[in-house]
Amino acid sequence: PEKPNFRPNVNFVPGPAVDYVCDLNEKFPFADGEFEGIFSAYLIEHMRMLRLKGFLSECYRVVQPESYVFFITANLYEQCKKLADKAPGAWDEDDICMIFAGKPDEPGNYHHCGFSPEMAVRYFEEAGFREVKIFEHPNCVTDMIIQARRGLG
């Protein structure tokens, strides 16, 4: 089979690999079912929780029926377990950044929400996705990969 077309690269800030800059809190400037799939890495934890449902509904709208979406995001449950396992007073700057900021490499690069695997499944299912599966990131136990499929409807 052919590789799925995961272009264009859409972001809310310009960059060398960005094809479209748009406000991801608004309706996407794409037709219904325009894309064969979506791949997103470390984006949704930077969105406001109140806008996340609309964002996921837009992702559902722009992918073709039976298509898959893949999201890599922080696993807040595993992050909290990691912090809880540390001795009192042993937290450092990296621990705080893990929960609240990701990598503070630019202004506004903060986490506005977080997900346990169960919460992620619920949000994706509420947006209409089916077959929602959560995988541990192979290189980082405190991150997860969300795979979900759009149904025929």
Language model: regions and residue ranges:
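S-adenosyl-L-methionine-dependent methyltransferase catalytic module, highlighting the catalytic core
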Residues: L50-Q64, Y68-G153
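Conserved SAM-binding loop
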Residues: P1-K81, I146-G151
